Amino acid sequence: GQNVLRRRGNRLFWTRPERAVDAIDLRSAAGKGIDIIDVSTGRVIGGVDEAAADRTVHPGAVYLHQGDQWLVDEYNPVEHHALVHQDLPGYWTQPQSASTVRILREERRRACGPGYVACGQVELTEQVVGYLRRDEITNDVWDSVALEMPTHTMITQACWWVIPDKVVDDLKFDAVHLAGAAHGAEHTAIGLLPMYSPCDRWDVGGVSTVMLPDTGACTIVVHDGQAGGAGFAEAGFEKAEEWWHATIMRLAQCGCESGCPACVVSPKCGN
């Protein structure tokens, strides 16, 4: 579309005088990122991609760069910058978000245990709604700050497990405990996915719900973090039985009493 490639026979050749590699952002495939600017000097100290900006450089966020702490004074996604100043606030910030998922197209499905597993295209909606200020020594929550950030929608690929009502009834959980159990299983499954798919846990995300309208049942969704999909969730679908069995075994065999980083605690959860 920009006449940067020319076909000769069965090959494509770069036609511009600058190097092709200079047009590729190693930090993000999502286009122009957000520059992080020191307000005292005007110097760009770093950058984040747009997909992560609402969570990392929202107003009031503590941004860590090369061991230094910076407080975000202003975040302007239209101008693609965040203004920061250096500080030692004594706390770190944890973004809080609200997420929903809608199944657009189920492409494959098969039985998996008492329920079934499927994969296909989903629409994700996410909004950062606030953040916690947590003590940098004890991790205790100081307070919660509300934010009014824009809602973002992304269409990508996902794999989802549907747990039938009979299994839910046998557990005899109330809605709160059922939601917590599904959420914990989602975290564990995401943490174990790199065993079955060439990804990092930061390359994927998840949503779990007691009742997803599209399935009519308790559903755990693991999705690619890239718009359009990256093949990670689909690779998980191919190994769903092994993946789900490993998830259950990790939950059953972990020696902790109330959840730990080895099982249900996720470093990236903001729900």
What do these predicted regions represent?
Residues G1-R11:
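A short, conserved structural fragment
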Residues P17-C254:
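Extended Lys/Arg-rich polyanion-binding regions
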Residues A185, C263-V265:
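Generic hydrophobic alpha-helical membrane-span motif
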Residues C254, G259-C263:
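Short cysteine clusters
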Residues V265-N271:
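Iron-sulfur (Fe-S) cluster-binding segments and ferredoxin-like electron-carrier domains
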